[in-house]
Amino acid sequence: MNKIRFLDKYLVQKIAAGESIDRPCSILRELLDNSIDSGATKIEVFLEEGGIQKILIIDNGSGISQEDLKICYLPHTTSKISSEEDLRKIETLGFRGEALSSIAICSNISITSSTTGNESYQIEVENGIEKCFKKQPAINGTIVDVTKIFHNFPARKRFLKQEPIETKMCLKVLEEKIITHPEINFEINLNQKLRKIYFKESLIDRVQNVYGNVIENNKFKVLKKEHENIKIEIFLAPANFSKKSKRHIKTFVNRRPIDQKDLLEAITNGHSRILSPGNFPICYLFLEINPEYIDFNVHPQKKEVRFFNLPFLFKLISDNINNFFDKDTNNYHDVIIKRQLTDDDHLIEMINQSENFNKTSTYDVPQNKNLETEDNTNEPNKNMIQKDVGLRKYNSIIENRPSLKENITNIFSDSFLEFEEPPNKNEEEDIKFNYIGQIFSEFLIVEKANEIYFIDQHAVHEKIIYEKLRNSKKTIQKLLIPIEFTIVDKNIEKIIDSEIEEYKKMDIIISKIGSEKYQLESIPNICNQYENTLINFFQSRRSRTINSLESDLYATIACRKAVKTNDILSVEFSKYLINEFFKLEIKHCPHGRKIYYKISKFELEKKVDRA
């Protein structure tokens, strides 16, 4: 007896519906995609009981003709593609011809539409079967009314969450569409009450409108970049904002929300120097890519994408974010918003003050990108730590720890690196502050402008050295004996092979001497004694970007050269560190940790009930 048989057509449709429609928010996503693809400039959304009871969408798009309305709910019917070639350059949100048929199978659906504005037609479908088709009064656009969701899918309906949770999922879908289509007016109604309106606006304003309350001062930086077939727009939070989860890293490709591990890593790597371990950035990435270079047909809900011939994409994202935090913030577009909350914390008023905002650096101190060497009599010299009166204890520490003395000496010597000339003291005055002292042999206490700073001596010295290294002149150094190393992972091997020429630009010469085998032949002079750091980078290349190679190297060198916890510092050297600290634009160590803690006079008075 035969065991394999053809499935009933209706059963096949129910199986297909179960793949793409798993809860009310899936229905909402598909209906919104159709409205957006129709060219609508206004979309009204009505949800009842989290979409479980009812989902109603009204748009002013191009509409559906009488003939198309009769077949639009049938499987594999679509107006968006007609050939295999169209799959290679998808420009619409929908394209499979499965959404309406899947919705019609698992619910009751009514569609009323007009293409002329003079007359409209309505079709009613229950369980995938047409029940009624009739003429209706004229409307402009389309109305889709979905009710009794999963009434014929009892197992699926049992697994739905409570109304507040389903509502939250629907609002998340709405957020994705609202943020990526600022040219559309959206009106949101929950349980027959108007909850929020988004008016047509720029992408900058829309991002501020939707995500502005994520950062306390409501200020985003906008980074724009164009490269060949790619347009990149990134909204970045200030360096001192981070989260304990990845929830506020969002990526959009051609206006689709995408969950892509590589994009997430590129964003995280770009922030690596300003984030401490366990923290994640607040970042919203928008990519516009020629459809011929991407494939969205890889996930049932189109949450993933494949990129073709774009090997540089992730590096481009990471490098630009990394460079953003290295440059003066004046070069970027500042946006300020003012949020006015109603009783239900939903309606938001936007004020874009970008053109009137007086753009200034975060810290009102002069820049200094040159290392101040021992030749300057006003700077600490080789023996500065031993000169402080009364620090006899430290004299013995220096004698017992020659490495510390050597490290401090090397930082200010020409034998360590070739540095630019120090600034003229007549041209650049020291920053005014009151140095109070050192505590726990770890922190420097400083008073400045009615605020007290507790500065991590190791972290700040590490950061100072790191910045000098990045801006120093470097020379190539050929190794007497090349160092051989092996790359076992085939994917990493391909990456290394493709980047050998880029390494040369960094004065790092490696050559392939066999399958999986390489040798390191030349390195920059500052990398002397740090060859193992280079090798480790190559062997873990999969999850890191080239720009992080320089950062990792300099961070390692700076960490080893900097003063350590438990080192007692002279007043002179402490003041030097503090002066340099206030010149730093980004006050994080190269590994992402914060350098300091600050408390104002007012905050301190509040703690002791004086304010």
UniProtKB/Swiss-Prot annotation:
GO cellular component annotations of the record: mismatch repair complex
GO terms under biological process: mismatch repair
UniProt keyword list: DNA damage, DNA repair
Gene Ontology molecular function: any one: ATP hydrolysis activity
Statement: the UniProt record of this protein carries the keyword DNA damage: yes
NCBIfam families xrefs: mutl
Family from the record: Belongs to the DNA mismatch repair MutL/HexB family.
Stated role: This protein is involved in the repair of mismatches in DNA. It is required for dam-dependent methyl-directed DNA mismatch repair. May act as a 'molecular matchmaker', a protein that promotes the formation of a stable complex between two or more DNA-binding proteins in an ATP-dependent manner without itself being part of a final effector complex.
The protein's name: DNA mismatch repair protein MutL
